[in-house]
Amino acid sequence: MPSSHLFKNRSFVLYLVLRVFLSLSVTSLAVAVGWHIYEATGDAMDLAFIGLTQIVPIWALFLVSGWVVDNAPRRRVLQMTIVVQMLTYCALAWVLRDGVQDVSWIYLLLLINSCARAFVGPSIQSILPGLVSKAELSQAVSVASTVWTTATTVGPFVAGYLLHWFDVNVYWIIASLMLVAFIAVTLLNEPAMVKKAQREWRDVVQGIVFVWRNPLVFPSMAIDLFAVMMGSVMVLLPIYAMDILQVGPEGLGYMRAIDRKSVV
């Protein structure tokens, strides 16, 4: 049972709000954009390209994002990435106002969105230890993880109904969710940065060699990588929702949410 004192910590509560609305916006985007593109083109490869635009930037920028988070104010990094994502949601609403005319614009906006998201994970994870005491850290991590998992489950379910009710205007709603996240991170009391020794590329290479040669770490990471790659088949769910089950966007939202229910 989490300590009640933990929820009296204003910064920690704002941190939870930040994580909730970031998760809701990201999962809602996945439901909405997959539905709209497949509804317009009927091509499974277009869904595959959505997956690529979401994962390639995160893989390509993982070293850069880590360096930036280590050397820049994390709240400022989060603010900038949230603004970029919010602008891409508004741009998607504008591009799709008359339906899908050119998917290349959608892919470009998703690529920009994913480049910004590559900096969110390292920033949001590294900011938590500075918001709570060492004695409360384990509880704070547990609560934050549970809240995030719940939000990623509820997000697709709610997004399906929002998509059914508002169609392409759902992207304005997703942008408003990101606006709440921006307000939360702006009100957050950022912990003081700890001065760290400058890292060199030699340190990166040593880390990779360590992972490769460690008989416990490498297999564990490989299994996790394989599971994540197989999880990418979720982008194909619009095919099942639209062509096979014919359940509509609300059904698609439920299908994307149902695999997370057991985790919660």
What is each residue range found by the language model?
Residues 1-264:
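Alpha-helical transmembrane-bundle signature of multi-pass membrane transport and export proteins
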